Amino acid sequence: ARGKPDIRTQVMVQRSLDTRLPLIYLNLVGGQDDQVFDGASFILNQGGKLAVKLPQFEEATELVEFQEQDGKWSALPGTKYVCKTEMSQDYRAMSEGLKDYVIKSGFSKVVLGLSGGIDSALVATIAVDSLGAENVMCVRLPSKISSKHSLDDAQNLIDNLQCKFETISIENCQEAVINSLSSLFMGLHTDVTEENIQSRIRGLLLMALSNKFGSMLLTTGNKSE
């Protein structure tokens, strides 16, 4: 959660002050189901003074020496990692969460639909950063109303990411579904129903690719959807 590192530090500083002792805070790093742990383990000396802080969202090991003076122990200064911006933290959390979820679920590859919009572009970028371009397949699924601008944007992203891609037209599938429903829809105005058929077809084709090639299917919707 945003602001969690600052809250964590404040609580631990207060604990160090209360006990008048050095404090070692160890934190898991990586994703576990829907939880993402940011690492960033740290050591505070008596009085809450920071001695060591390890990186966020990275596995790290550091040898720390303690010294005694006048009967009081303190850690010698070491790495002091500076947390990145909140937006950078958000991106790293999504990247680490995706990577660990895919791997711990027994997959090594992913597949996703690429529309040319910002949602799927961000998911594709996170996937490539997390798993490597060779393990990501992006699929364009155009219909007869797909704009050239959207298709070009999708192609530009694929060129930049250097990941595998395929293009599968959904026009034939869409026509088959509409024809199957034509007698029931006769006399009714075209509305969101026909639009939603497109997304259902895309989902069906992407799931087929996922099943056939053993790739995890990534969704690309945002909270508004």
What do the predicted segments below correspond to?
Residues 108-114, 118-155:
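ATP-dependent adenylation/pyrophosphate-handling site
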Residues 89-111, 205-209:
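Phosphate/ATP-binding catalytic cores across multiple sugar-kinase/actin-like superfamilies
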Residues 161, 184-225:
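Active-site adenylate/phosphate-handling loop in enzymes that bind or generate adenylated species
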Residues 99-108, 129, 133-136, 179, ...:
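Conserved helix-loop functional segments at active or binding sites
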Residues 44, 51-54, 59-93:
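Catalytic P-loop NTP-binding/switch module of NTPases
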Residues 1-58:
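CN hydrolase (nitrilase-like) catalytic-core segments centered on the catalytic cysteine
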